[in-house]
Amino acid sequence: MYHNLARKIAPKILTIRTFDLGGDKLAHSIDSPKEDNPYLGNRGIRFSLAHPEVLRTQLRAILRASALGNVRIMFPMIIDVEDFLQAKRVLKSCADELYEQGEKFDYDIPVGSMVEIPSAAISSESLARECDFLS
């Protein structure tokens, strides 16, 4: 899917946000505890980092698509810089894995964050130093 989108939209920029899964829109095949308020709990990047197999699968697919066009990655529901850096470490691990397998992709793919919760807005200056872009 990402492969086809990247091909069709090139040379325009394709920004792909990683999944914003959580209790309010959880895939039934993923085990996750029931939350009193799923809108405030374990969702977005926190959910993805708690389920690395899901995040890694998506990141590898996005990286493969980056070989075909101007693709960038955006992480949702980032709380602070540490959230972003942790997600970037997972991305680097996926990139290293694909590189070792000889797959083509943009190793320098731009990586950004959505600023959609108050803590991200408060830390936006330090977040901006680590991100290639903010949305």
Question: What residue ranges belong to the model's regions?
Answer:
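Conserved alpha/beta-domain cores
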Residues: M1-S135
